[in-house]
Amino acid sequence: MVPLVPREHMLRQFFHEVVSGCYPTYTGLDDSEVTTYIADLLTEFTASENLYRIRDASGKPLREIGEMLTASDPVLGSAPSFDAEREMRRHIGDFALFSTGMYPESMHMRRNPLDADFMEMVRTGKESYYIVSQFDLFEYKQEAPFFARLSEEFERCMYGLTKVREELDRLGAPKMLM
């Protein structure tokens, strides 16, 4: 994901403070790599072009997880390579984590009855991070264990995001980003 918000921007710093305060306290995850990743994810997902980054063949943003999964298939979908599949799966994991952690109620408001429910979204997020972790050669070797951790700790990370949302609500942040 190409950062749209500069590293030194106050919004990024704000999310880093909130996430690094909530995660160790409520989840027991005192892992700066995880909290940095989550805070950066929140920052970048404030831009809808990052939240709905996967596109169909005509360039239309895909908003449903099922459509994203189909697109990520390098044989049957629109992913032109296994590298593109990895990047799409990373995004699917990020999207699932964000959706289930920050906006679990959005799972009940889905317009398409064929789209994933809450538990399916959790399973898809974990599976997507696991698939990303299996790209463990060459340029991906160093970050593969991190995505394995995200897969294993998905529910704790999701719970941490619910606590982040509670903290944002307490501070008077806007209610809906999705």
For each predicted feature, which ranges?
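Polar/charged low-complexity regulatory segments
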Residues: 1-177
